[in-house]
Design a protein with these regions (language model features):
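N-terminal positively charged helical leader segments and presequences
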Residues: 1-68, 119
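RNA substrate-binding interface of SAM-dependent RNA methyltransferases
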Residues: 69-156
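Generic beta-sheet signal
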Residues: 75, 157-158, 176-182
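Short secondary-structure boundary segments
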Residues: 107, 161-164, 184, 208
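Strongly charged, low-complexity linkers/loops
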Residues: 161-174, 179
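A C-terminal functional module that forms or caps the active site or interfaces directly
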Residues: 178-194
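Structured adenosyl-cofactor binding patch, chiefly the S-adenosyl-L-methionine
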Residues: 190-229
Length: 229
């Protein structure tokens, strides 16, 4: 059964669906009054709900709610925004499919694009979450500058750096809250790398090939999940 999204609470009885999803439900999926649909709130709950009113904003009545536990492993990607925004949006979409927990755009010395449209990325995340049939919505944080981020985030941090020979293995993963930092196409500056090492941030290589920023991020998510499963 297809999955839809609404930010409902578990004690709600009725849900009003937004206009875009209402249109898809009625026109694309040909649902009608009396039909049952599945809705997630992106916080681990999925409800089965009956359509009770059609219109621009359809209304549904919750019949049953199922709650799902999240994996213990939490992966947070701090990544430099890309000049080609479509490639960055592709990363956000695929990272959501892979079950990422958080994404933070970070501005480092060689970052070419300083701003991102958080609202648009939020819509991409919701769409990808529904498509991949997940009930937890990743958090997309506001843009942070490099120094502010590494000073205020408490996750175990690992930095991707082509200049090191350290390979990603289980020895680098000491907790269930991991933050992997991915720099822009030119990588992090020498000054940023030194600051990271002084802040006890580990550095790893992702191989001999020079990867695009978005490729490096997706590869890293997959590698971490493979090592911890």
């Amino acid at each position: 059964m297809d999955l839809f999204y609404s930010n409902f609470d578990n004690d709600d009885k009725l849900i009003t669906i937004n206009q875009i999803d209402s249109k898809h439900i009625i026109r694309s999926f040909r649902k009608k009054i009396g039909d049952i649909i599945k809705i997630t709130n992106g916080k681990g709950s999925v409800c089965e709900a009956e359509i009770i009113e059609e219109g621009k904003n359809i209304k549904v009545e919750i019949k049953r709610i199922l709650n799902y536990k999240r994996e213990k492993l939490s992966i947070h990607i701090a990544i430099s925004p890309l000049k080609n925004i479509s490639r960055f949006e592709w990363f956000v979409e695929k990272a959501t499919e892979l079950g990422i927990n958080q994404i933070t755009p970070i501005i480092s010395e060689f970052t070419e694009k300083k701003k991102v449209n958080i609202e648009r990325l939020e819509r991409i995340i919701i769409s990808s979450m529904k498509q991949s049939n997940q009930c937890y919505k990743p958090i997309i944080n506001d843009v942070k500058d490099y120094l502010s981020f590494i000073s205020n985030n408490n996750d175990e941090k690992i930095m991707a750096n082509m200049k090191t020979d350290n390979k990603l293995d289980k020895g680098f993963i000491k907790s269930n809250n991991i933050c992997l930092m991915i720099g822009p196409e030119g990588g992090f500056s020498d000054k940023e790398i030194i600051h990271a090492l002084e802040s006890n941030i580990k550095e790893i290589t992702l191989g001999k090939n020079r990867l695009r920023t978005e490729t490096a991020a997706i590869y890293s998510i997959s590698a971490i999940k493979s090592l911890t499963n």
